[in-house]
């Protein structure tokens, strides 16, 4: 079991080359590890232990009844969830169902699919990362040329800096499409986490979207007057109806009480995922707004470069941003996070000097204004 968990580290191994943002990494690293771990836990509990244990008379073999109720779902009665336990009902939602209507029955058929659903969710969270990794194509790593460690001879260092500078000079204003692909991947991450909230809401018959809020409300209110949302969605005890032929050839109905110990685990998993997905949604939404500001505000690009790379002179940053486009800014920002700070400062200064002394890359615009993307 521990070996399996250790194997997850290689699945979402984070490269020493930084090509994305911390929020983006939360989606494909932390979240994937969480979902895969939960899937393994549920799978282990489901196939190693007893995920369901139904109680009935000896007329029906226990393994037959357990298998039937596991496959064909169980149910509880909505009208009995607010009844007093120990007096009116043995457990919330469990009672006499002989005259219960179909509308009063709360059917539970999700539990055998939880481990597969969690695994599928993990794949969806990793998909934007896989897409960006394919589109990025190792560009940052190739341009670094081991200049991130800064330990090489001065001659070799000058040669590599000149190669990097020549690339930036020859390809200036040609990186917009490359940057927009990354922004698309961040937007896909936002769509994914929101879509998964709706997916789980459908998975739990419309009960998941407000699950976390309902739990908080229940904890703050008088619990005798409110239905526990965790017990309602993840009951520990339910009912199952089994039909078989009697000795006379007539169909006999048998009601069984089923214990679902796996729901103790499922309850904790999904209350955590609800809050985690809300946090991811908020952070990713803020990131998208941040990207929009960067696209339309060159002055913000200048400010961010100055804030992040303080060794680079302000006039050099302003010249580069004025003569380049948004995609170039994105590439330089990514390079700055990976290169040795002194080397990055030198490259930026050399690029600014070359732009200042040569009008070949001048972008038409209003005099005195920083050129828009």
Curated annotation (Swiss-Prot):
One of its GO terms (molecular function) is photoreceptor activity. It is found in: Cell membrane; Cell junction, Gap junction. It is a multi-pass membrane protein. Residues 43-106, 200-268 are extracellular. InterPro entries: Innexin. Its main location: membrane. GO terms for cellular component: gap junction; plasma membrane. The chain crosses the membrane at residues 22-42, 107-127, 177-199, 269-289. Residues 1-21, 128-176, 290-373 are cytoplasmic. One of its GO terms (biological process) is response to light stimulus. The keyword Transport applies. It comes from the Eukaryota. Keywords: Cell junction, Cell membrane, Gap junction, Ion channel, Ion transport, Membrane, Transmembrane, Transmembrane helix, Transport. Structural component of the gap junctions at electrical synapses in distal and mid-depth levels in the lamina. Belongs to the pannexin family. Monomer. This is Innexin shaking-B.
